């Protein structure tokens, strides 16, 4: 790799570190090509990406970034799993690590916050952005349906009372 290519890689990695909601660093020693392709496909499906980069270039790209403390994790054969959604990459990495013992999560960063192994696991258990939006919409919609039910209740109560009176009259 010549100097221009290295500078381009450093620039790309810098953009990744700035724009990603979460970056997970893991060792991937011993993974087969098909296993790496599976990891990439899972990350892509979740809206994330996977990148293998030289540790030295990644450390240069981290200089001056909010997640600079993550540079200590960049030793050995490392892979970066990242996404704009702060939860997606962590979930993909955790799920993949459970199935592949050769994939060892070291930690990562979420914005300015450095994450250790337990931190990545905790982030992976959080609801995704879509799940949070769905629950907020559900909370907003619930009062409206309750009001509609309360407005319709007197009419249904009257109908129920009238049908009971009618049944009693027919029985007598």
Swiss-Prot record:
InterPro entries (UniProt xref): Ribosomal_uL10, Ribosomal_uL10-like_sf, Ribosomal_uL10_bac, Ribosomal_uL10_bac_type, Ribosomal_uL10_CS_bac
GO cellular component, one term: large ribosomal subunit
Molecular function as annotated in GO: large ribosomal subunit rRNA binding; structural constituent of ribosome
One of the protein's GO biological processes: translation
Keyword Transferase: no
Pfam families referenced in this protein's UniProt entry, alphabetically: Ribosomal_L10
Keywords: Ribonucleoprotein, Ribosomal protein, RNA-binding, rRNA-binding
PANTHER family the record matches: 39S RIBOSOMAL PROTEIN L10, MITOCHONDRIAL
Family designation: Belongs to the universal ribosomal protein uL10 family.
NCBIfam families: PRK00099.1-1
Function field: Forms part of the ribosomal stalk, playing a central role in the interaction of the ribosome with GTP-bound translation factors.
Subunit structure: Part of the ribosomal stalk of the 50S ribosomal subunit. The N-terminus interacts with L11 and the large rRNA to form the base of the stalk. The C-terminus forms an elongated spine to which L12 dimers bind in a sequential fashion forming a multimeric L10(L12)X complex.
Annotated protein name in UniProt: Large ribosomal subunit protein uL10
Gene coding for it: rplJ
């Amino acid at each position: 790799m010549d100097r221009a290519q290295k500078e381009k890689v450093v620039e790309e990695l810098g953009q990744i570190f700035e724009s990603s909601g979460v970056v997970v660093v893991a060792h991937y020693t011993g993974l087969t090509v098909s296993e790496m392709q599976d990891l990439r496909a899972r990350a892509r499906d979740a809206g994330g990406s996977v990148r293998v980069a030289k540790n030295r270039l990644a450390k240069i790209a981290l200089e001056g970034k909010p997640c600079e403390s993550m540079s200590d994790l960049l030793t050995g054969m490392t892979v970066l799993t990242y996404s704009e959604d702060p939860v997606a990459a962590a979930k993909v990495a955790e799920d993949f690590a459970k199935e592949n013992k050769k994939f060892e999560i070291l930690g990562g960063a979420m914005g300015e916050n450095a994450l250790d192994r337990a931190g990545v696991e905790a982030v992976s258990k959080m609801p995704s952005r879509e799940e949070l939006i769905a629950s907020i919409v559900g909370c907003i919609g619930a009062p409206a349906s309750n009001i509609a039910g309360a407005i319709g209740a007197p009419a249904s109560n009257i109908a129920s009372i009238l049908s009971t009176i009618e049944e009693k009259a027919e029985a007598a």
